[in-house]
Amino acid sequence: MTCPRFSRAARRVGVVGLMLLAGTVRADAPKTAELTPDRAAKADRLRRDLREMITLARDQVFPALANIRVITVRYWGGKEQKGQSVGSGTIISADGHVLTNYHVVRNGEKFKCTLADKQEISAELVGEDPLTDLAVLKLDLSELNAGTGPLKVARLGDSSAVQIGDTVMAMGSPFALSRSVSLGIVSNTERILASSGDEPQEIRFNRDQRTGIFNRWIQHDAAINPGNSGGPLVNLAGEVIGVNTRGMSFGGDMGFAIPSNVAAQVARKLIEKGEVQRSWYGINLKPIKKTGYKEGVLVNSIVSDGPAASAGLQAGDVITHIDGEPVTVWFTEQVPPLLKRLANMPVGSTVVFTYRRGDETREARVVTAKMQKDRGEEAAFRAWGFAGLDITDRMARARRLDSTDGVLVQSVRRGSSADQAEPALQRGDVIRRIDADSISSLKDLIAVYDRTMDLEELPEYLLVAFDRNGRNQITLIKPKPEKEQDPPRELPKAWVGIAVQPVLPKLARKLGEPDHTGFRITRVYPKTLAADADLQVGDIVLALNGDRLIPRGMQDGGLLQRRIRRLDIDGEAALRIARGGEVHDVAVKLERTRITPSEARRDINREFELTVREVTFFDRDENRWDEDVKGVIVDRVEPAGWAQLGGLRAGDLIQRVGAHAVRGLKSYRAAMEQVTEAEPERVVFVVLRGEGTHFQFVEPDWRPAVGEKDKVDSE
C-alpha cells in the first residue's frame, strides 16, 4: 500500500496545525480528498434528496401531532392533590383518536389537546394500558372551529421491518414547547432493560404498577426530552413505527420507542373495549442460559393458587413446548415476546404446556384466567383525613394479606381526625369495618362515607376496625373535622405608627454620632397619630419616657414597640430623638395596635382551592392603596387547583367575582356562594396585580369527585 502524497501547501498547513496541537508531526496523515465540481454537485444532490425525504416524511405526520395537557389528581398526604403534566400524541383515526403513553395521561382528570392549527380542544380518556405504557384519548370534535376540515391522520407502519441503521425522526412537543423534530438512527430493534442478572428488569411506576413487561423497545438516538413522551417515531416513508416513551441524555442521546405493531394492537383493543383483556397464568419465566438445559424456558416462580399451579406446574419445571410448538428462551430479549404470546391467548382458553421435571416429561393443561389490574382505584376521604386504595390480587400477594377484602390506607393527612385518633391510622393499614358496616372494597367505604356525611347530625365518633401487621385493632375517628379557626389576634395594646431599624455602634460612628445608638425611623405611617407629631424619617429614637434605648443587635428590632405596648392606650409617650446632631423631645399620642397580615381573618374555599384574607392597614401602606381600594387578598392557591389553573396568584387583590363586586370578606363569601350554586362554565375574577388590573378566567369542573362529597367543608 503506497503512502498518500501531500502538496507542499497542505504539508505546511498540516505541520503548523499539528505542532500547535501536540508538538509532533505525522508524515503519514491522510490526504484530504479534492472537492471537484462533480463531487460538489453529487454532495449537493445528496443533501437535497435527504432534505426532501425528511420534509416529505415530516409533512405526513406533523399535521397529526397533538400536544397534550393533563390536569392530574393523585392522592398523597391523606388528600387529593392536583397537578399538571404535558406530553405528545398522534391522531390515528378520523374520529379523533389520539395515541399516546399511559404515563402521559396517568392520574388524569381533565385533558386538553392542541392541534397543528393551534386549536385547543377537550379530550376524554378512551382507555389505558399500564403494562405496555400506552393509552388512547378521543378528541371532542364538536369543539373544532366551524369550517375546520377533516382531521389529519398519521399512518402506522410495520415496526417488524425496522432495521438497525434506519434513519428515523422523533416528533413531539419537548418541554411543552412548540412542535419539533429530531433526527437519528435506529441503534437496536429489540432493546430491553436487563437487570444485573439474567432476567428482564421490572419497571414500575410505583410499588404496585408494573409497565413494559411485554415490550422490546426500538432504541434510537433521536433526541427525546420531557414532553416528547407519547409522540411518534417516524421513518423516512412518513410512517409511525413507534411511540417514543423514554429518553436518556447521558453518554449521548438514547431514546426508546414502543414498536408500532404493539401500539396498533393495543390501541385497537382500547378503542373497541376500553381495556386490553389478557390471559393470566400465575408464572414467572426465566431464560435457561445458566441452567445447563439446552431447550425450554424455566418456571422461575409460581403463584400458589394461580391457573398454572392448579394444573400441576411447579417452580423449577422447564417448559419445552406450548400447544405442541417447541419453545426455547436463551436470552432475556426473548422473554417479553413469549409473555406477550401467552397473554394474548383468549381468556378462559386451555393452553397445553409440555415440561420437564427432573428426568420426566409431563403435560399440564392450563385454563387461563383474566389478568387483573396491578393497582386498585383510589379515593380521598377529606373529612376523615386519609386516602384509600382498593386491594387487588397482586397487591394482596405482595403484602402477604389473607384476601383482597378491605381498603388499604394509602396516606394520612397530618393533624386530621385519622391522624389524631388513638391509635392513629397509618399507611399500610387495612380498614375492615366502620361501626356496623363491613368494608370489603373501596366502593363500600365511599358509600359509608357519603351516608355518614349526609347526616344532619354527625356522630361524635366512628368505630373503625383495621388490620396492621396481622393484628386486628380498633380506633375512634371523629367524622367532623375541627373547624378551621382564624389566626389568633393579639389583644389591643398601645402603638406608635412608625417603623424603625436598630442603630448599632458601628452604624452610629459611620453616621458621625457614636453616642446616638437607638432606633432610626424608616417610615412614619400616614393617617396615624404619629404622622401628626414632629417625627421624620431619619430621626433616631434614643429614649422612651426618659429610659435610654440601646439595642444589642438586630434581634432587638422590636424592642421599641415592645416597650410602647406596656403603656396605656390613648396615653402619651415622650420620645427623645436625635436629628441633625441635635437632640429633641417629641410628645406622641398613643393609639391601638393595628391588625397585621398574619392576624387577618381568612376564607378557605375548597372548591376553588383558594385561600383569601382581609386587607389590613399594613397591606394598604405597603402597596400604597388608599381607602377607596377594596377587595380581598389571595393568601394561597393550591397547586393545579381551579384558582391556580385560572391564573390567580398569591398577593392578588380580588375586586370582582363574575358580576359581584368584592369589598371585603363578607361580599366575597356571598359572591362565591352564588357562583357555586350557579355552577357556570367560566368564572371571571378581576384582580389588582401590581400597577394594573387583570382578568383571570377560571374554568371549574363541577362534576363531583369520587369519595369527595363533604358537606362540612363549607362550615
Annotated model-derived regions:
Residues 2-14:
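Bacterial N-terminal signal peptides that target proteins for export
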Residues 316, 428, 538, 651:
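Conserved catalytic motifs of ABC-family nucleotide-binding domains
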Residues 389-399, 403-415, 610-645, 650-654:
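C-terminal accessory/binding modules appended to enzymatic or scaffolding proteins
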